[in-house]
Amino acid sequence: MGKCSGRCTLVAFCCLQLVAALERQIFDFLGYQWAPILANFLHIMAVILGIFGTVQYRSRYLILYAAWLVLWVGWNAFIICFYLEVGQLSQDRDFIMTFNTSLHRSWWMENGPGCLVTPVLNSRLALEDHHVISVTGCLLDYPYIEALSSALQIFLALFGFVFACYVSKVFLEEEDSFDFIGGFDSYGYQAPQKTSHLQLQPLYTSG
């Protein structure tokens, strides 16, 4: 019962992670955030691997999934520090998120709750084929939305890591017990064959 509840809980957390990652992937695509898109793709693959390992009793897959979650927590911690401009990090260095391929920023910058976008005409700051906008009236600025999204990912990852370690430990213990029982049964099964063969041989020759 405990094993089943652990597996079911891990699958539930993996499904929540998958939904949250897909939701984040959509908005990162809309904002052309190529670095987060790549990280989200790897995370989705790792979560699918974790679900498969849980359902198929594969402890190695769960270990790989848990190892990825450590990297995923570190990445999301970096995202939080980046958008909140902790230390030397600054949003002006947005080439980190776009691999310096565009000037796009987070989709939430213009589409956040309550945001009003106003084009700034004849601005000297505008580059070629680009325009400057003014965003006002946001109920929650986009850096905080991105930080909250990353905090949710960290929360799910921490719980997933704990349950992945627990379930993989249960699977490893079961594999060891099955190997021991299987070896003992195979050894005990050969002895009756030899004795029965010795008992039947005289009966065959006398007939």
From Swiss-Prot:
GO terms for molecular function: ATPase binding. The keyword Phosphoprotein does not apply. GO terms for cellular component: plasma membrane. InterPro entries: Na/K-Atpase_Interacting. Pfam families: NKAIN. Glycans are attached at residue 100. Residues 22-34, 83-146 are extracellular. It is found in: Cell membrane. PANTHER family: SODIUM_POTASSIUM-TRANSPORTING ATPASE SUBUNIT BETA-1-INTERACTING PROTEIN 1 (PTHR13084:SF4), T-CELL LYMPHOMA BREAKPOINT-ASSOCIATED TARGET 1-RELATED (PTHR13084). This is Sodium/potassium-transporting ATPase subunit beta-1-interacting protein 1.
